[in-house]
């Protein structure tokens, strides 16, 4: 009879109403890394590293770049005859120069402080070319014969368009004294040069005077140049050399030239009409008729991500360059579908990765929620409040990370002349060091935030579990797997009250107490029955053993195998 009662009690326990706390799972295979683990599969993740570009040169915020094609910056500014398409250029967003442009200084020589001039251009968006000393004004000098086969144009000798190579006229080279006053409101870029002949014969042939000089002065510049006559190997068919110089003439300032030979005079100058962020970018790409906010030598980036790994040199509103190959932020939960039935490592709070062994793919409308079963059926229901708070929290955190990191960031190349190689090497080492620090910071940030996000989800599930536990108290039994088994009947209305936090503990406490005591009584009665049976079994076994020993002894005494002596 006791066994039948026990069996009925067990059956009734199996059919008891239950409510479980759980979390969302899906078919996602996205993985993230944390401080403690690698390749953690999560339900949702967000990539914050841009790895793609369009492979084109694009307008930057609607403004076209100045693509110099086969011309260098020097060829453009001095007016190499092969660069006539750049005689007048509109506003540019950035300048593109090939690594080794064919049309540079056609007449061999050097451009003084060339790298510094390029740095100036990286803060300029528009030049306006103006004539400052007309070519026709050199009545006492030959301003037409100063051409060279090194600078051909349509098969004939020519020269730079923006400067004038002055030669003697009628066997005389009178001393030049010229001035130009900058009456413009803008700064003016002025260029001039000096010719270094191959020998003394060439010197007198071109300039008549054997000893010459060039003097240039402004309010901030005091320069005196003399030609260096020397025998040199031919470059572009020329043994002579030309050296070019430049200065920025401020408004209301004047520039004065004095020379008795070897003078390359300015005809045109460049009015700096607009200053702003620009860059000189080394690239072999072609124009792609596109628009972007961020340009690299590899192509344009159109992305809202805070990091990229495409190229360290950029112009525009760009993500920060890092050397990483993967930066993924966890936004969802650990993805542990219940069917896997395997225990994961514990998180900080141990909820998702601890006593709740698997997520629910059937719960699709929230991150956390409930599964109930009673006589009316079973089903999943998301906890909208905790889910929305979690979504808001994670979204705000991701946006905050992106906002903090996704500031305007430009990294343009710096150029150094041959005398500055040690500075260039030091600059490269510093830039590499900065990139290493940025990369380390970005990777560490992602690892820490992923750990915090997953623990945040663990904590939310634990909080939801505690919310239910505190409501039910002893009206239900904790099963240890995230579920509670009611000691009373709990219909759908009762289940809903547990979910929304309005469960009426006193209403069900009496029924729960009676059922709890009945179950406890069955257990105790069963335990007592088994104890009595155990005692009876022990006594009976001992008595049977004693009888067997006595019978064996009498039999052995009767056949002489055992001698029995009774002493009184």
UniProtKB/Swiss-Prot annotation:
Organism, by scientific name, is Influenza A virus (strain A/Goose/Guangdong/1/1996 H5N1 genotype Gs/Gd)
This protein's assembly is summarised as:
Homotrimer of disulfide-linked HA1-HA2.
Note on file? Major glycoprotein, comprises over 80% of the envelope proteins present in virus particle.
| UniProt signal peptide | 1-16
Q: For side Extracellular, which residue ranges?
A: 17-531
Q: Name one Pfam family in it.
A: Hemagglutinin
**Name used for this protein in its record:** Hemagglutinin
From the UniProt record, report the name of the gene that encodes this protein.
Answer: HA
This entry carries the following GO cellular component terms, namely: host cell plasma membrane; membrane; viral envelope; virion membrane
Which residues pair up as cystines? 20-483, 58-290, 71-83, 106-151, 294-318, 490-494
Q: Which domain of life is it from?
A: Viruses
What membrane topology was assigned to this protein in its record? Answer: Single-pass type I membrane protein
What family is reported?
Answer: Belongs to the influenza viruses hemagglutinin family.
| Upper lineage | Viruses, Riboviria, Orthornavirae, Negarnaviricota, Polyploviricotina
